[in-house]
């Protein structure tokens, strides 16, 4: 009589949890951000938004809004709206905030996705047109009075 061998079914390899993150040595924790606002997928090229953003960075909010009101670039209107949103977030944040003391602490402009389109040209050709978008982030700070 032939002996039948019984095999045990193979177990699937169990996944291990990743090792815990190492604590950073001698580095303070990142400070909590102040009042901030962000704008995603702005349909203006980042290069053009940065021209306006460089003028506004570091200014008091009231002065920045006044300047943006009379700036002819297409990015000025959305940036002014973003600043007003950040001021509203500062007022809504719970603590008493002096709106006159707020200034633009950080203002970053990053590139968003490009929308690729084609423009018909002569003799059956087509040129690619890239419609660029921007992501804008603004954080406000309070000027220390002294």
Curated annotation (Swiss-Prot):
Keyword list, A-Z? Ribonucleoprotein, Ribosomal protein, RNA-binding, rRNA-binding
What are the GO MF terms of this UniProt record?
A: rRNA binding; structural constituent of ribosome
InterPro entries per the UniProt record, alphabetical: Ribosomal_uL22, Ribosomal_uL22_bac/chlpt-type, Ribosomal_uL22_bac/org-type, Ribosomal_uL22_CS, Ribosomal_uL22_sf
Q: Where is this region: Disordered?
A: 1-39
Per the record, the coiled-coil ranges are none
Looking up Pfam families in the UniProt record yields: Ribosomal_L22
One GO term of the cellular component aspect? Answer: cytosolic large ribosomal subunit
Any single GO BP term: translation
Q: Which cysteines are joined by disulfide bonds?
A: none
Q: Which domain of life is it from?
A: Bacteria
This chain's function reads: This protein binds specifically to 23S rRNA; its binding is stimulated by other ribosomal proteins, e.g. L4, L17, and L20. It is important during the early stages of 50S assembly. It makes multiple contacts with different domains of the 23S rRNA in the assembled 50S subunit and ribosome.
Q: Which family does it belong to?
A: Belongs to the universal ribosomal protein uL22 family.
Q: What is this protein called?
A: Large ribosomal subunit protein uL22
Organism (species)? Anaeromyxobacter dehalogenans (strain 2CP-C)
Q: Which gene encodes it?
A: rplV
């Amino acid at each position: 009589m032939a002996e039948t061998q019984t095999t045990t079914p193979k177990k699937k390899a169990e996944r291990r949890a990743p090792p815990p993150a190492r604590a950073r040595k001698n580095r303070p924790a990142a400070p909590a951000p102040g009042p901030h606002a962000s704008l995603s997928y702005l349909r203006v090229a980042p290069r053009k938004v940065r021209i306006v953003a460089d003028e506004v960075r570091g200014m008091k909010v009231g002065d920045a809004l006044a300047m943006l009101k009379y700036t002819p670039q297409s990015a000025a209107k959305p940036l002014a709206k973003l600043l007003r949103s950040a001021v509203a977030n500062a007022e809504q944040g719970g603590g008493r905030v002096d709106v006159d003391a707020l200034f633009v602490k950080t203002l970053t402009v990053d590139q968003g996705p490009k929308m690729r389109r084609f423009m018909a040209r002569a003799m059956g050709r087509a040129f690619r047109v890239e419609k660029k978008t921007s992501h804008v982030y603004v954080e406000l700070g309070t000027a220390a009075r002294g």
